[in-house]
């Protein structure tokens, strides 16, 4: 490709890298998937994301569910008050980071997404449900009455969540457990969003928590991440 306006040019791989803010390997995987081709891999080293496609789909649907509750749930006003008044966040920055609302109640997400046994099992494996100790095979929502922060991998796939309580409830922050697609020590919250602004990050600022990353981004500091 070649742009006569700015002089940018390259091949299909470099175009996908620039357009989608991906590295070389990620661009190869995207192009291979679009062409229905398989990327050769070392024997014995299958891609953990391909193995867990159903789980990733449910985590993405969970993020969408929480975002919808922030807009339409009868108790969404307190979430808006916390985000806008207490934290000073705009609706736009909340949208950029995909913030949501987990309503009060023990089975809201379960009822919305987990009607089938196999889906419940995937939600359990993804850390979204907790099994009742006194009733094996019965589950409840892990995240209840919290502001929800989806945790994305560098390609933008939702792999986990953090949930912030409104008051003094303990724990103040509740995070997803480690799963097949989420190892906390290997992820940086906000890295995907930072790459959308600057595909090649010369340096990053490491801050304490989710809200620090979001507040800095709202004020133009878009290269911060949290561990």
Question: Could you describe each region identified by the protein language model?
Answer:
Residues 40, 94-101:
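Terminal amphipathic helices with adjacent charged low-complexity linkers/tails
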